[in-house]
Amino acid sequence: MRARKGGGDAVTVTARHYAATLSRHGATPSGVDWESRAAQDLRFVQLLKLCNFSRAFSLNDVGCGYGALIAHLDQFHPGCRVTYSGTDLCAPMIAEARAIWAGRPATTFVNRKGCAAMADYTLASGIFNVMADCAAETWHTHIADCLSDMGAHSRLGFAVNFIAHHAPDVPGLYRAPDGMWQAHCAAIKEATVETVTGYGLREFTLLVRFSA
């Protein structure tokens, strides 16, 4: 990845970026920087390997956007009761999510960084991919803070995905150094970390599990 100097703080940069994509594309996959619903679902499938769908559970969705994960859960896991808490840095995204999912039981949305409540599991899809003009050191601090927050608000574990280091170096995108975030996550509550690859994308998913 090309070195960057200067740039804004991570929260402001991220909120501004997604406000712009939402303004251009609306509450669609393109509005949250995914190429298609299928691409979203493929990533959700990997992240949700963390969860036990044989019983009800609570779930934090960090960087929830307009709530696309809810549509995935309703389509592919309709028999499982999930208490859902979505958070996002982008206020317009939260407004869209509240409008789309108004009246859905056990569902809340909050405009904030990190988790809004304790939950059994926490997921985050693609929230570290777009660093825009942030300096690498600033972005690494942001990621570490977010992962620590996810760990602190998860009873059973959390899952997150990253663009792999061997992916093409695209300006403004963040490619994770090999092994860096696996080691970081393993140090959170002495977690067990599973790295999921081989699903057709130049990225990986971390499933971080805590001992019962």
Residue ranges, per PLM feature:
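Conserved beta-strand signature within the Rossmann-like core of class I S-adenosyl-L-methionine
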Residues: 154-164
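A short SAM/SAH-binding and catalytic strip from SAM-dependent methyltransferases
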Residues: 121-140
